[in-house]
Structure formats: structure tokens, C-alpha cells
Amino acid sequence: MDVNPTLLFLKVPAQNAISTTFPYTGDPPYSHGTGTGYTMDTVNRTHQYSERGRWTTNTETGALQLNPIDGPLPEDHEPSGYAQTDCVLEAMAFLEESHPGIFENSCIETMEVVQQTRVDKLTQGRQTYDWTLNRNQPAATALANTIEVFRSNGLTANESGRLIDFLKDVMESMNKEEMGITTHFQRKRRVRDNMTKKMVTQRTIGKRKQRLNKRSYLIRALTLNTMTKDAERGKLKRRAIATPGMQIRGFVYFVETLARSICEKLEQSGLPVGGNEKKAKLANVVRKMMTNSQDTELSFTITGDNTKWNENQNPRMFLAMITYMTRNQPEWFRNVLSIAPIMFSNKMARLGKGYMFESKSMKLRTQIPAEMLASIDLKYFNDSTRKKIEKIRPLLIEGTASLSPGMMMGMFNMLSTVLGVSILNLGQKRYTKTTYWWDGLQSSDDFALIVNAPNHEGIQAGVDRFYRTCKLLGINMSKKKSYINRTGTFEFTSFFYRYGFVANFSMELPSFGVSGINESADMSIGVTVIKNNMINNDLGPATAQMALQLFIKDYRYTYRCHRGDTQIQTRRSFEIKKLWEQTRSKAGLLVSDGGPNLYNIRNLHIPEVCLKWELMDEDYQGRLCNPLNPFVSHKEIESMNNAVMMPAHGPAKNMEYDAVATTHSWIPKRNRSILNTSQRGILEDEQMYQRCCNLFEKFFPSSSYRRPVGISSMVEAMVSRARIDARIDFESGRIKKEEFTEIMKICSTIEELRRQK
């Protein structure tokens, strides 16, 4: 039967059909090859927006730098980064006037955080530029390598375990005349395999010592590595994103802590909240503007878009903001917070892997690393690439490009939001001193502006004033991409507002389906996603029921676990049929063991094992959940696990789901091929960290786990904890005297070994 698609929408208000226009079904586009071109684009564009600034040379690194601050005021509508310091400071002062004590209180909160944060805060996050190896690594490994190098160079403040002390080492390291580092390298040799008698390539990993002089070390410490942003939907061109090294991260973290604390107190800020809380905040601002625009006033809303938000932001401006916000605070605190923007005004962008050349006729491929772009003959490149390289050449040093203006994506989301809100704050009548006034919402580079005025001319005047104020602060509202509507219909951070928020269901589409973690987690995540969408995204009961049936079907095909009485033949059907026949209570079998599905939309909150527990045969229960069964996962599973969901836009979300350890919660093994590469040493390090951390968590379960403040090593902390716990257990009769003595003996042995070491 042919369905005319327009019929589907006859009864649906147009705004509810917005979902169908989003590019969120199917696989998102990924980038291949190097990100060098995209990074050069970013660097060149950023300099172009600030081209009328002042050029200077950094005395330490010799890098050319462009400073657009207080540059000429723009005369056209082209994007520009000429922020005016006095305007930014004035905007901050007015923000404080409207929110008395906001900066003061946030500083006090932040100071507390600064003194308590442990250095392991930096292990969060995924890929990080590891300056010791000059490439990306998992955050924990990059931090470990940095600390190891610091210690071997006599920097030991970090041993206290406090982040602030690690940062003291970072500052100290920048004054050193040279830094010794250990780098990994690979040797390949051809050897004959004893078994197959074939020639194979054997790789061995070597470590070698290398000394970096002050200049080279500074360049690495100020380097942001760049990659291409993957899985970005609805865009034709890819773009580059940056990952900073460990020297910068800690400082950025403290600045963002202060900015987050300020954003929490600002009603126009869309960060750091999300989801329903964000919608409530938004709805409040809209309500305020609509109630205040009585019959005499018009109210219009701009769905705003800024041109190249972070390429026109400037770290020097952030420094001015921080200097103002912390003006009555202790010297040490002001210094700690001002280092991040200072490092960013001297940052270097690493150009990535370089270019790949291939000759079709000779079947040759060769890589031109980024370091060579400064000297290579340009005749090998096509026109557009040649122009890029010519433009960027004066800025190149050791394979990195000097990039003083601009911010790179996602580094100071909170702080730049504060800047945006400070303009929205200026819309109050007492500041505009005329008949129009404005308010709105800001979330990083996204904004919605609500303007009220007695007539259309007033609205136009208000928008113009807002636009010009933005220009003074280095923010460029795009006239092409922003549009205006009667208040009541707008879009902000992909939330569509039409007299209330419309569920944009398509955004959730990518998270439906089977995740591919393991049978147990997948079942749990699948039903939780459906449950969450019924709560938050207008997923109706009939559709949810259908989604559930489709999910179960998908799940059975993925894990080849069709019901035991089905005719479908798969690799597993023989085993599953056998189990089905010898099970008395067939309803008790899990879906992944060929059992029936007992889920419906009323019981989605119950883990499948619990749902069927009473229906299971006893011996099945014993096999499924017996900790002595070697196939029951050996990692203890807390009652809640976290899955990382990739929503259609925005950062990966953490989603909690119930987890019950059974024979189905297996963890797949790592791919063997990594064990033959230069990553192997790194992998072993990573596993060692993992083991230490897991052990530590056993001693300090989260319920009783207050971060140890004070200077003791992990081992000392665990030993003293073991002694306390053992004494309590012994006195309350939970353990016997022999066990107690044995524990005490082990503790003493450990301490003895530590002393000998």
C-alpha cells in the first residue's frame, strides 16, 4: 500500500513535525585521513578575523602573535575579534550590579574547590595530548607520564596529590633550562617464524632519553593537538577540534569551576544545567517577557546564531574578565586563575599528521609530516592547499602553528557563557534608558534574544543596539542565520519552543537499539532508553509498546537468541532448544537464553533478572547468578552502571541503568593486535593503574569514601583502613580471632616491604 506522507501530518500541528526534518537517522558521517587541512583553515580564519590587530613576537618561543584587543571598531558586517577591554569590564560591572555579590561568592566557593581537588581530577576525559610522546593518549596515561617526567626532573610538589601542587610543578617546569623526557620508539626487524617458516615483521619497543631545551619544552607545554570532529550531522564540511595537554588542563579546570559557579547563579545561562531543568529555566524567561509585554507592547524573539564564536573570542579578554571578577581576592588565587588565559594567548596548534601523497602510476604512497610544511616545495600541492600553506608559514614552529587569538572549541564554555549573559543583562530598562528592553538565554555560543518594545521601530532599534553591543565584545551575531518571530516560537540549543517545548524526538533516535556491550547491559539499556523517552520526550504508550517489540526483535537477532520454540535456525538454536526442553518454568528463561519477553511499558524499570527471578527453575538461578560460576563476570557490578549514550547533538550523555551481575555480563577481551605495537607498554601501564584504582575503591567504598585530604600514599591509606575495619569486624564478632591476627600480620608485612623499598 502506498502512503502519501503528507497524510501523516494532517492531524499534527506543524511544529510537532519538526523532528522529521532532523538528519538523525542512519549513520553519522565520520572523517578519514588527516585533520591537517581543517586545522590550517581554523588558524588562517582566526587570523583573518583579527587581521587589523598588532603583531608581536613571543620572546620565549619566537612565535609570531597577533593581538586584536582594542583594535579598530568594525565598519562592516564581517565577523571580527576586536573586543574592547573597557566595554567588557563595564559589562562585568553591570552584571555584578544586577547580581550583588555574585563574583565574591563564586570566588569563595572556587577557592574551597581549589584547595580540595585531587590531581586525579585530570584523569577524567578521553584523549589528551601527551607532550612527552608528542601524540594523543588516554587522559590517565598522559597524566602519569607527565608526573613521571616531572619527578625525574626533580619536581616533587605533586606528591601531595593535590591538583594545586601539581600546578606548582607545572609553573616551575616552565622556568627550567631543560627537561629530560623518556620517549617510546619502535624497531622493526624481519625474522623467520619458527612454526610457519615464513618471514614476519617483529616490532620491539624501545625507550630512549631525550633532553628538551626551554624553548622546545615551552612549545610543547603550550601545544593543543588537533583532530577532526567526528559524527557531526547536518554539516557538509568537517571541522577541527583541539585537545590540550596536561600543563593547561588543570588551570582551565579551575577557571571553568569559577565560571560554572557564576553561571549557576545567572537566570539567563543555559549552562551548566541540562534536560528538563534547562527547559524550566527557559520557560521562566519567556514567561517573564510575555507577562511584562502587556497589551501595549510587542514582543519578538530572535533564534540566534553567532558566526565563528570561538574564533573571535580572545583569551586576553578572558584574562580581563578574571582580573575583574577576582579583584578583592588573595593574590595566589588571582594568579592561579590568570594562568589559563595567559597560556591560551600563547598557544600553539599542532597541525596533526600532515598530508598523504600517492602516485597512481608508481603505486607509491608517502606521508608529508606537518613539520615539513615549513620548508617543502609547494609545487606538489593543489591551489587551495598551496594558499593555506603560504598563509600559515610565518606562524610555523616545529610542526605547530602559533595561534594567539581565538579559543579553540569547547575550552571555556562556561566563561564565554558569562560573557554572553553580560550582554543580555544590559537589556534591562534601567540600562537601555529608552522604550525597548531585552532579555534572553545564552548557552556557550547559542542564544535566544527576546526583545520587547511599544512598536516595530522599537524592536528594530533594540535588535540593532544588541547587535552593536555584541560587536564591542567580540561576538558576531550572524544576520544571515538568525531569524526573528513573534515571541512564543523559537529554537534554543535544539529545543523547539511553541507556547511550551515541543519534544524533538529525532534527537533521541540514535540511542534506540542494541548497544553492543553485552547481553545483560544491552537489555537493561534498551528498556531504560524507552522508559526515559516516555518520561522526557512525549513517547506515547502505543509507540513505546511498538518500540519495545522492535527492540526485543533487534536484540534477538543481534544475539541469535530467538525463543526456544521458534523455527528460526541460528548458530545458537541447538543449545537454546536443548535448554528450553529441559526447563520446567519456561517463563523464567532470560530473553538472551531463548526465553519469552515479559516486558511491557509498565515494568520497564525492573531489571530482567529481577522480573523473572520468581519464575526461574532453581538450578537455572544457581547457574545464572552464582559468583562461583566462572562465567559470571568477575567485576563487582554496583547496583547502577553508566552507559555512554551518543545523543544526536551535544556531548555524550551518561545514562544510568540497573545492572545485575549474571553469566551474561561478560566483558569482551582486548584485541590482540595491540599487544605487538608501541602501545603495549602504555596498555600495561593503563592496566596497572586500573588495578590500583580498583583495589583502592575496594577499601574505600563510595558510601564511606571521603577523599583523603592530607598527605598519605594510597598504600598507607589502605593499610590503615584495613586495620580499622578489621578491629571493628573482630570486636563485633563478624570475623574470628585467627582471621584478625592474619590481617594484622599482612598489614605489618606490607609496611615492612615499603620501608625496605
Curated annotation (Swiss-Prot):
InterPro entries: RNA-dir_pol_NSvirus, RNA_pol_PB1_influenza. It is found in: Host nucleus; Host cytoplasm. Residues 249-256 are annotated as: Promoter-binding site. Belongs to the influenza viruses polymerase PB1 family. A motif (Nuclear localization signal) lies at residues 187-195, 203-216. The lineage of its organism: Viruses, Riboviria, Orthornavirae, Negarnaviricota, Polyploviricotina. It is an enzyme of class 2 (transferase). Influenza RNA polymerase is composed of three subunits: PB1, PB2 and PA. Interacts (via N-terminus) with PA (via C-terminus). Interacts (via C-terminus) with PB2 (via N-terminus); this interaction is essential for transcription initiation. Interacts (via C-terminus) with human PKP2 (via N-terminus); the interaction competitively inhibits the interaction between the RNA polymerase subunits PB1 and PB2. One of its GO terms (biological process) is viral transcription. Its main location: host cell. RNA-dependent RNA polymerase which is responsible for replication and transcription of virus RNA segments. The transcription of viral mRNAs occurs by a unique mechanism called cap-snatching. 5' methylated caps of cellular mRNAs are cleaved after 10-13 nucleotides by PA. In turn, these short capped RNAs are used as primers by PB1 for transcription of viral mRNAs. During virus replication, PB1 initiates RNA synthesis and copy vRNA into complementary RNA (cRNA) which in turn serves as a template for the production of more vRNAs. It catalyses: RNA(n) + a ribonucleoside 5'-triphosphate = RNA(n+1) + diphosphate. The keyword Iron-sulfur does not apply. Disulfide bonds: none annotated. It comes from Influenza A virus (strain A/Henry/1936 H1N1). Phosphorylated by host PRKCA. GO terms for cellular component: host cell cytoplasm; host cell nucleus. Keywords: Eukaryotic host gene expression shutoff by virus, Eukaryotic host transcription shutoff by virus, Host cytoplasm, Host gene expression shutoff by virus, Host nucleus, Host-virus interaction, Inhibition of host RNA polymerase II by virus, Nucleotide-binding, Nucleotidyltransferase, Phosphoprotein, RNA-directed RNA polymerase, Transferase, Viral RNA replication, Viral transcription. GO terms for molecular function: nucleotide binding; RNA binding; RNA-directed RNA polymerase activity. Its EC number is 2.7.7.48. Residues 286-483 form the RdRp catalytic domain. This is RNA-directed RNA polymerase catalytic subunit.
